[in-house]
Amino acid sequence: MTRVRRGYIARRRRTKIRLFASTFRGAHSRLTRTITQQKMRALVSTHRDRGRQKINFRRLWITRINAVTRENRVSYSYSRLIHDLYKRQLLLNRKIPAQIAISNRNCLYTISSEIIK
């Protein structure tokens, strides 16, 4: 069987992979086989962490809202606030009240007191 000279095509493919892995440390940025393995691993990690990031931010927003609502009113909690928001048909996602809780706590207090009425 004759030898096939791949030419620039294989080199172009490898350099493309090397550019992706240029910030990796050690052999992970130098050796072609380990570069491809690490690239696959990195892409799997980014795909997984994109989903996990949404979960983590939602948890953070819930924690912030709950902390401010419990601080202002002793008997009031996050779950009761969200329930009252839905009862009043106020379409606020958890990101907006969390941002209000950080920047202006009194504003969140007035919103919650208006909902209770």
UniProtKB/Swiss-Prot annotation:
Q: Does the keyword Zinc-finger apply?
A: no
Q: Tell me the protein family, please.
A: Belongs to the bacterial ribosomal protein bL20 family.
Q: Give the SUPFAM superfamilies listed for this entry.
A: Ribosomal protein L20
**Pfam families in UniProt:** Ribosomal_L20
NCBIfam families in the cross-refs: rplT_bact
Question: A GO CC term?
Answer: ribosome
Where is the protein situated, by its record's location annotation?
Answer: Plastid, Chloroplast
UniProt keyword terms in alphabetical order = Chloroplast, Plastid, Ribonucleoprotein, Ribosomal protein, RNA-binding, rRNA-binding
Q: What does this protein do?
A: Binds directly to 23S ribosomal RNA and is necessary for the in vitro assembly process of the 50S ribosomal subunit. It is not involved in the protein synthesizing functions of that subunit.
Q: Single GO molecular-function term? A: structural constituent of ribosome
Report the main location listed first in the record.
Answer: plastid
Gene that produces this protein? rpl20
Domain of life (superkingdom): Eukaryota
Query: Which BP terms from GO are recorded?
Result: ribosomal large subunit assembly; translation
Question: What name does this protein carry?
Answer: Large ribosomal subunit protein bL20c
